[in-house]
Structure formats: C-alpha cells, structure tokens
A protein has these predicted regions:
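Helix-to-loop junctions at the C-terminal end of transmembrane segments
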Residues: 1, 85, 183-195, 279-280
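Cytoplasmic membrane-interface "Motif A"-like loop-to-helix N-cap segments
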Residues: 1-9, 193-204
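C-terminal ends and interior cores of transmembrane alpha-helices
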Residues: 10-24, 205-218
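Glycine-rich segments within core transmembrane alpha-helices of 12-TM secondary carriers
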Residues: 63-79, 263-271
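Transmembrane alpha-helix termini and helix-breaking/packing motifs in multi-pass membrane transporters
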Residues: 76-95, 155-156, 270-286
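C-terminal membrane-cytosol helix-exit motif in multi-pass small-molecule transporters
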Residues: 100-119, 300-305
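Short amphipathic helix-loop junctions that connect adjacent transmembrane helices
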Residues: 152-169
Length: 336
C-alpha cells in the first residue's frame, strides 16, 4: 500500500503536468481522468494506512494535523500561483508543468528517504462488505451527499445569488484553509475527548442549521460566514474514520476504505445531476434537501455507542446486523 500510494501520487502529478499541453475539450477530459485516478487511489490508501499505522488514542489529533498540513499546502499553492502568474506572467502550460513537475520530484524524494514501514496486519486482497459495518456505510453515503451540497451548490449560490467574483470565491477558499490550519488539530483533540458519537451529533445538528440558513439567507456577508462554517464542519468527519478504526477487524481496513470511497461516490455522481434539475426551478429547495440529508445522518449517528469497539458497533440492533458475538481485543475497551 505504501508503494501504491506513491505511484498514485506520481500519476496525479503527471496528469497535472500534462494538462497545459492539451487545452481542448477531449484533452482536458483525459488529463482530468488521469489526475482523478491518481488522487482517488491515493486518498483511499492514505485513509487505510493512517488507520493502520496510527494508534487509536492518537488518530483523531493526527488526522486533524493532516488536515492542517493540507490546508497549509493549499495556501502555499494559492500564493505561488498568484505570484507566478500575476507578477512573472508565466503561461498556463508552464504553470501546470511546474506544479506537476515539482510534485513528481517530491514523490521521488519521498520514495527515497522513507523506509518501507511494516504492516501491523495482513490486509484482505479482495473487496468485502460486512453486515456489522452497516452504520459506517450509511454515514459514508450521506457524507458524500452532504459534500456535494457544499462543493457544487453552496459555491454556485455565492456566485449566482450574491454575485461573488472569482477573486471573492478564491478569498473564501483561502479563509477556509486558514481556519482549518488553525482549528483542525484542535477539533481532532476534541473528538478524542468527547468521542465519535457526540462529535458527529454536533456536526449534523450544525449542518441542519447551516443548510436551512443557506435557503433563507439574503445577506452576502452572512452567506460567506455560513460557507466558512460549513467547510469547518468537514474536519469533524474525522470521527467517522476513527469510528471505523475502533469497530473494524485490523485486516479489513484497506478493503473497507476502498468500499467506503465507492459508497461515498455513489452520492457524488447522482446528487449533483438530480439536484441540478431542482436548482433550475427552486434553488432554495436544494438546501432543504441538504438539511434532510443531515437529518438522516443525525438519526444514524444516534446509533453510535459511547465507546464503540469490535462487538459493540451500534447501540440498537433492530436488524440483527451488528454486535455479533466476537472475540474482543484484550487491549481494547470492553465496549460497555
């Protein structure tokens, strides 16, 4: 998985480097698919290795630090692009070549300087879905649906309803990254302190308020504040990953990470198309649908135990899909 992660990053960087050389529709389709394959395979393996390598009591804070580092890199990239294109006047072709080339060099350096870390357990080499992970699958699906409301329609609202320019939206992105840089590690520590159940309940209640407010807001500054808060809630999704880490068999992590990405993207493919039709006739209704998604997530989150473990995956077991009698890890909590 470690080698595959680096190969995926290299593939993404190659796609970025080639983008400037294909400034036409079919060419951009091909380079975007190449970048997307590299990105999505890397993110899947990244989640898998993080959950395997990092101890359960350290994982929330570590994932918060990961988000902070990603935000720092995004801010650095924004600043570099602005400086190189506005002050030095470099072309799109050179910009893409430079970004992809630097990324590829970094991947090679990482390949050379990091040792091959040992795997704590042998991972399944095939796709699997377990009945006792049903709650995690459900949370993952609605998380994908919620992400599309933010990525597609909240941004579109800022432009269409409030007349935000490219520069205004870019500034909002930078504020989002700055907030993540500051608060994501703190959110990770907070999740470790209060537990996955309370963290996700707070997130989904907050999202219901944000989505309903999107539908009602008339002030562009309040809308911008909602946009930043909405993005900050993404950091609380750390709790979903640590919930999986606590309930999953160690050898299931890699396969379950792949399955969860697939489930997440079922919503990512379907939701924008369906709600795009709704947007044409009633944009506010899109955000009420988003609030409904958040409500479904909230109802699911109430079924997370206070101390989830293998054998104690859910609070109520109406469908007999979880809490199977299983050997309990002597190093873990009893799940009471």
């Amino acid at each position: 998985e470690q080698i595959f992660a680096l190969i995926s990053l290299a593939l993404m960087c190659i796609g970025i480097a080639l983008t400037g050389w294909f400034p036409f529709e079919l060419g951009l389709y091909c380079t975007t698919v190449l970048m997307s394959i590299g990105f999505h395979y890397f993110e899947t393996v990244n989640q898998s290795l993080t959950l395997q390598w990092i101890a359960k009591d350290q994982a929330p804070h570590f994932m918060g630090q990961q988000l902070a580092m990603k935000s720092f890199a995004s801010l650095f990239a924004y600043g570099s692009i602005w400086l190189l294109m506005e002050w030095f006047g470099i072309s799109y072709t050179v910009m893409y070549m430079l970004a992809g080339g630097v990324g590829l060099v970094i991947v090679v350096v990482l390949w050379q300087i990091f040792p091959q870390f040992t795997q704590p357990s042998n991972q399944h080499k095939h796709m699997l879905m377990r009945k006792r992970y049903w709650l995690y699958y459900g949370l993952t699906f609605f998380s994908g649906a919620r992400r599309q409301i933010f990525m597609v329609f909240a941004s579109f609202m800022m432009v269409e309803k409030f007349g935000y320019s490219v520069g205004d939206v870019s500034l909002l992105f930078m504020v989002n990254y700055l907030f993540n840089l500051i608060f994501a590690p703190k959110i990770g520590k907070w999740i470790h302190k209060v537990g996955e159940r309370k963290a996700l309940l707070v997130e989904y209640i907050g999202l219901i308020v944000v989505f309903v407010s999107y539908a009602l807001v008339e002030n562009p500054h309040i809308a911008a504040g909602l946009y930043v808060i909405d993005h900050l809630f993404f950091a609380m999704a750390i709790a979903m990953k640590t919930y999986l880490q606590k309930i999953a068999d160690p050898q299931d992590i890699a396969s379950t990470a792949g399955v969860s990405f697939t489930i997440n993207h079922i919503a990512a493919v379907v939701i924008p198309a369906l709600l795009g039709i709704v947007w044409i006739t009633n944009p506010d209704l899109v955000f009420y649908v988003g609030a409904l998604f958040a409500l479904c997530s909230l109802l699911l989150a109430t079924n997370i135990p206070t101390s989830p473990t293998r054998g104690n995956e859910v609070v109520a077991n109406f469908w007999l899909w979880a809490n199977e009698k299983r050997p309990v890890d002597p190093l873990s909590n009893t799940g009471k």
